[in-house]
Amino acid sequence: MKFELVKKVPIVELYGKKCFVDTGRSCVVESINPQIQRFFGISRLHVAGIGSLKRYTKFDYPNCEITTSDDPIPLEGGDAMPMEIRENCKWPGWLVKMTVGGVEGMYYIDTGAAFSYVHNLSTDFPPAGIADESSFDGRPWTAPMRRVPCEFAGHPFEILCGDARDNKARLDCCAVPPEGVIGYDFFANFTIVVDRIDGKMTFAARANF
């Protein structure tokens, strides 16, 4: 299915509803706060969580396409690696191993996050302006961003990243799991196929497209 990027978040038509796809939520399709609808500028917007996806899902941001299937989805030239799948828990989502700002760990990759957030972000990275954000209950807030180098499976890329702890202290609406969340910039740099059952990701770096 084709999607439209609105504020760096994929918007699709699903079950006859306009939805933004959020791999940080375990629901199928749910209604959302009217304030969030206003933030995106889309009336009657819903959220589609990972419960709406089948066993295999391909995210292809360069072509604005999401494919989900019960059958394996090929990715030509892709490499495979294990990933952690968490569903029906406090922090549902998908985690992969990467290095963010020199810190190696398991990080959530989240289609519902326009920007990335980690805890205790170093101020050594160059500032990159202010991001306009909205919490999931619809409260607007702003977040200072920094340009942070990352590496995933030997492939370098860069993200716009904020400090989750600082934002949570200023306005208690930045719900970021301890591992941190990597948003749009990951998907802009890698086309991926996720196997939710076996906990495996096949990926191709954008430089190889």
Whereabouts are the PLM-identified features?
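Pepsin/retropepsin-fold aspartyl endopeptidases
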Residues: 1-209
